[in-house]
Swiss-Prot record:
The lineage of its organism: Eukaryota, Fungi, Dikarya, Ascomycota, Pezizomycotina. Its EC number is 2.3.1.86, 1.1.1.100, 2.3.1.41. The keyword Lipid metabolism applies. InterPro entries: 4-PPantetheinyl_Trfase_dom, 4-PPantetheinyl_Trfase_dom_sf, Fas_alpha_ACP, FAS_alpha_su_C, FAS_alpha_yeast, FASI_helical, Fungal_FAS, Ketoacyl_synth_AS. This is Fatty acid synthase alpha subunit pkiB. It comes from the Eukaryota. Fatty acid synthase alpha subunit; part of the pki gene cluster that mediates the biosynthesis of 2,4-dihydroxy-3-methyl-6-(2-oxoundecyl)benzaldehyde. The first step in the pathway is the generation of the decanoyl starter unit by the FAS composed of subunits pkiB and pkiC, which is then transferred directly from the FAS to the SAT domain of the non-reducing polyketide synthase pkiA. PkiA condenses the decanoyyl starter unit with 4 malonyl-CoA units and performs one methylation step to yield 2,4-dihydroxy-3-methyl-6-(2-oxoundecyl)benzaldehyde. One of its GO terms (biological process) is long-chain fatty acid biosynthetic process. Pfam families: ACPS, Fas_alpha_ACP, FAS_I_H, ketoacyl-synt, Ketoacyl-synt_C. Pathway: Secondary metabolite biosynthesis. Residues 143-221 form the Carrier domain.
Amino acid sequence: MAISSTADLAPSRKARGSESNDRALKLFIELLSVETQQQLFRGEPCIQRFVEIGPRTILSTMAKRSASIQKDQRSSASCYSPEFLSYHDNQPEILYQYQNDQAIYPLSQPTQPQFEPTSPSHLTKRSPSPSKALPMSAIPSAELTLQAGHVILAMTAQKLRRRFDQVPVEKTIRDLSGGKSTLQNELTGDLVAEFGRVPEGVEDQPLSSLAESFQPEFSGIPGKAMSTLISRFISGKMPAGFNQSAIQEYLNSRWGLTKSHATIPLCFAPTMEPARRLANADEARAYLDDLVEKHAAFQGISLVPSNQVADGHESLAPVVMNVADVDEMNKRTKLYRAQFDSLASYLGVDYFASEKAMSESESRIAELEETIRLLNTELDEQFIKGIKPSFNIKQVRKYDSWWNWSREELIRLLNEICQDSSSACPPDMENRLQNLLNKWDANCSEIVRAHLIGLQSRSSAPMNKLQLILEEIFTLGNQTLSIDPLFVHNLPPMGPQTIITDAGCLEYHELPRQISHYPEAMAYGPPWPQGHTSAPFIHIKTREDGQDWMYDSKATSIYHAMLDVGVTTGLTFTHKAVLVTGAGPSSIAASVIQGLLSGGARIIVTTSRSISQSADFYQQMYRQYGAKGSSLSLFPFNQASKQDCEQLVQHIYGPDSPTDGDLDYILPFAAIPQVGEPDAFGGRQELALRAMLVNILRLIGFVRQEKERLRIENRPTMIVLPMSCNEGTFGGDGLYSEAKIGLKALFNRFYSENWSKYLTICGAVIGWTRGTAIMQTSNAVAEEVEKLGVITFTQAEMAFNILALMTPALTALAEDTPIYADLTGGLGSMWNIKQEISAARKRISERQILQIAIAEEDAREQAMICSASTDVESGLPTTRHARLGLQFPPLPDVNEGYPNIEGMIDLTRIPVIVGYSELGPWGNARTRWEIEHRGDFSLEGYIEMAWIMGLIKHVDGHAKGRPYVGWVDADTETPIQDYEVPHKYHKHIMAHAGLRLIKPTKLDSYDPSRKELLHEVAVEEDLAPFETSKSTAEAFKLRHGDCVTLLPIADSDNCRVYIKKGAVLMIPKAVPFDQVVAGRIPEGWDPARYGIPEEIVQQVDVTTLYALCCVSEAFLSAGIKDPYEIYQYIHVSELANCLGSGGGPMKVIQNMYRDRFLDRQIRGDIILEHFVNTMGAWVNMLLLSATGPLKTPVGACATAIESLDIGCEAIQNGRCKVAVVGGCDDYGEELAFEFANIKATANSTEELSKGRTPADISRPTASSRSGFAESAGCGVQILMSAALAIEMGLPIYGVVAYTHMASDQIGRSIPAPGKGILTAARENGQAKESPLLDLNFRRAVFDAEVALINKSHPKQATTLKPDHSETSNAASLRIRDAQNRWANNIRLSDPSISPIRASLATWGLTVDDIKVVSMHGTSTKANEVNEGNVINTQMRHLGRQMGNPLLAVCQKSLTGHPKAGAGAWQLNGCLQMMQENIVPGNRNADNIDKQLREFEHIVYPMESLRVPEIKATLLTSFGFGQKGAINIMVSPRYLFASLSNSDYEDYRSRTTKRQRSATPTFVSRIMKNNLVQVKTRPPWNDPEAMQNFFLDPNSRVVDGQITRAPRTAYKHQDISVPQSAAVSVNEALHAMLATTDHSSPAASASVGVDVEEISSINVDNPIFISRNFTLLERDYCLSAPDPRASFAGRWVAKEAAFKSLQTTSTGAGTAMDQIEILEVGGIPKVVRLTSQLHGHAHEVAFAQGITNIQITISHCNNTAIAVALALRKND
């Protein structure tokens, strides 16, 4: 009773004696073990010493274990731990006998930070320098010898992976090992090996006690185990030459340690091993110095290093030699020289030859240097770099999958039209439709037909309009099937407009010209001087003998006729082959390519930029404009390189030609920007001249050579020369005009040289083209220039002008004579254009300056008129804050249109997904989804990624010395706002996430550029000896026999080992491995950041860490903050753990096999972590504490779906109600190496050489795919029966409609792709007509059967929900049987129906309702073809409607292939697609393999598509070893349709509350770095009741208390949102005040509040119960489901009631039965005092005029809270 008192709280001596006597009596009488221990360790006051008197240490050990368990259950106020002593082992302590022996451990140990292995990079390099002072010896303050305690401490610390000075010696082995029995057993075995024997119960004795036990028999030198550790340390970490003797010698010379003393730090050395072998002696000395300093600090002694360093660098006296010695030395030198000369003469060796060769080499080098200097001087470095060849046939990209892009674009267009049926005209509809018609095929017609069929049942005005549009598209599409694609220029003529705004800003616009018909506008011409013939703006010129080029009206009319065709019927370029150079963004050539692609041409385009930078631009161009039969091949090419020109032409005319070995047109438009007048010409100008003139001529020559070689004489290639009207008129543009003028010479060469039958010439003199890279800055003056009577062009207009020159009519004309096309728009006749442009710029500038001045004057005038004090809205920019969340699924209204399945579904057998998570190359599921469907991150995504990668952390305190709450940079501690995160960390995140180059990390030091292997070598000569321990030396002898000789070292246990000739050694070597790209977890990921304890991180495999993170986050995504909440609804045996793995714990396996073979130091119990099921075991031990089945599927790449299948099966057959499913694998170098050996993975080194980036390595369905890219990670789903999910109010992300596993046929190939999952579609022809597929039929039969059941059981309620009462159990079973037969599994009645069709029919869906297929898509040649074939065959067999293709999603293009986690990530993607109705594209599929074209039921989108609704998804997964898997998910909306409106609204309300509670918890755990909540105890507080709990199927756990209140599958209960006690009290008080019955208008009140932990109420003490609770209260509480919680509630109510009286307490021992709490109207209340309060309580209440006390009781977590309101009646 919490009542304050001033009395002394300590009991008197007499009272203490009485209590001791009472306890002694109880212990004497109650001989049962359990009761005895409870009295000992739970009673008050606590015992201080437990002494066992007997021949052995038995009872004290048992008592200590029991006390540790009892201690965990005591409140935080419990007393300290007692001391356990045995007369056998602790006689001096019992008798209080103390020894004055030398202290083995210091009295106090300094607190040290958490140990990390010493890295050599952290060691200070000590450079000895000569000193003038005399050398001084180091003398330690105390001379120590090796004690048993040192060895025990060193061995224990080494096992625990801690530094020796971080292990508290007062703790036991059991405490230090954290209760891990294997570690205790291993350490005990090592102690036995070291000391020979150990006392019984060694694990429960403090290290200090063990040291005293072992010390009397300790020899003072390391034993076998310790010597092995030292030897292994020296051989594995110290540099060559630093053996044990050398180390001891250094410690003596440097620190003055004797050999015995030096052994102590040597024993401690294995506890602080450096991360890698120390590279040299300096690093070794620095390491040893650090070791000795820590040893001295630990021992509490003083050590001062000597200034003399024992490495030969100490100060030395001058050396003096006499003359005789010098003469003798010279004689010997002459003798050696004579012998050398004689031997060289005898062998015929000219030792001057090397000097001669060196002289010649130096001369040659000098000549080359002079040549290079000359080239750099004449041409300069820029020219030399500019001619470097870049042509690389391996980097060629080819795009020709127009057939797939047509389907994707059509589906996108139809979706946009259907989604906006009111307008039904998306932007740019005409151009998009024209491009689409150019690539139309029969599949497109089927797609439109399918949409039209779907509209027939939706009659309305908008639908009728939509139907007309689709019918028109259908008609136009069918018409184009039999004609060639056409380029139609349907853009109006555009003119420039420059506007100066009121504020003085310059704005450029383009407006349609007055003449809307482009050829008509071009037919006009500029004003010509009198006497000259007027020519159109664009025209053809010819030349007569002796004349200049003149306007040719006849040829011009032909040209303009082609322009007319181009804007009406269109131009076709089908079967034409074109080479285009210089087609960069915003160029004229790029617009030409667009027209050529629209016309069906096959194009070769070159780029001078890197392929990885430019490929996207051309691929997007092809996707938009590529027509039937068109192709686009992209080549790296430098037009300034002669080699490139030659190699390009040779390839075009070679056997692998992309244009069938010839060209129809060449457009050499490549140009190099240049400026400068003649006095400033340099290498760049010469380079430009070479590219724009010289190498164009070379191209002509190379083409002529190839055509002549191949005898192609009847198909001349037209070269469209990019000429210019700028023939020096602009000036200051380098050699640009000279290059263009030089091209004119080809008009004469056509006649004077003999290549005219192979090539023809068309010179296109290009006019002012707005918007190009060159003319972009001159757009503003274009309008002024046009005022001079000329015309300027857009890029599309100039491209159209050029395309008209490439028509058959003009091509035929060019065969007779070169064509001179004047496309200048009249600009070519202006010789003073530069002056005009300058004047135009000046006029615009003057107008702009004037307008700015006017605007400033107006502003000042307005300021004066409106008063300067008038504040104007400044529109301060708002900063957005991130809203982190779990992205719960929406809970929409279930409107009409869903199938009538209410009550038909047995929800206890329907598995649903209520939570999911993943950890992969792109972070978690939310961040991966953003990058997958958006291509970038949202603000929230950036923050989550930055947190995952350790770039930011959250601070709630101070930052930079100021109070601050928010994110800070993890390195600098600088505060950073949410909106700053994307800009600051974008580059880092993108470079260190996803598929990327493999680099050594903190978790894995693997470097593929230096893959280590062992090479066997036979020794050919005796090797120099080395020193090692005796045991190791004997092991060498055992292995090598006579090839090894051992020589013991005096005064040492070590031996010197001599390796003789004939011995076989394994020498490490490093080779580069070509797999250098993988999708590893984002760099910087740290399990400790998720809240996983460091001891767990050090012990388990990384796959277990992944799983722990994912399972924790998956439960949060289900709105479950504590997994133990589930046990309020199910028995612990009904939760299954089905997590699987394909490769298992790779790092542990590597350590166990490789490192053990290499005799490296690894844990002795590592075998426990090597089992595949260990991952699931850790998840259960640390998070779940379930007793359900732990199943571990191993299905290679299909593991996750196999896990899903197992979980669904467990739920469907009723064995479990919840299952944790998924898969996890890590990246391992061994696995990667073997995958590469079978050619399953892409050779990333080769791919990088092809111009691919690491992100492009995985390209599922692409024609260039070459294998998958490996990745790592984990994916998890929380699977649950739908009934339980609805009962708990959990979010439902998707319904698992079907899972299926299949193997395959006879064969010999394990990785061969199989077709076994075709069986999921098995059915005969009659099955399609089965009446069971008619939902109306099944509804009617089901209703009739339920009516009969209700008639047979009149007591059964009319509802379809079974209540599981005894009287209605039979009816419930019959109803569930009917549900199963007519809905859940209709194949029970007709097995001929395919499983896929039946699973969809349950929800009133058909195979046509599947919208998306998430494909396994590994990016291998075989898989995509096989998988597409299997899916297409299934759809065809099931009768899927033509024109309704599945949208394929290939997630591995983004994530790579994680093996076991692949299916889980795919499944998560399916859930996200259904939630947002977005189908992400495969951005790496730049060109779809033509082998996939035959699969008419599949479309492979490259960009994300938004669709109206996704009702169902299909998922396929294939694993090596005949593992085929398929899964169908259904939208949760259909599950909601099976509920009544009232049930759904109730579910929606409770789920919304849960989501609102879970989101803040998730955000808080992110900010506090405790996302993973590791459990330290099972969900029950009383371990003794565990057995009964396991055996009772109705047992449940509520707030740590066991209850027998079973919940039915259909009973809905409100979610109790856990809150803090303070919040609960506040809410309870407000609720009470709101409901208080104020019968009297004049009343006052006083409040009392009390809070108590439920576990602190000892309901097992009958005296306590009888003294404080009345008989009625006892009867009420004992009949409650949880008596302890009920008593706790009554207790705090009594306390609160007493506090509300506001009187002085009579003592803590006062009985509380004077206050009785009864139920009045369902509300706990203190009734009228006259009959219920007694004694002192009644007197106080009566004196204060209290007439009524109202109380409210609530429970929060493991706490009971009560608020009492005492009402007084005022006079």
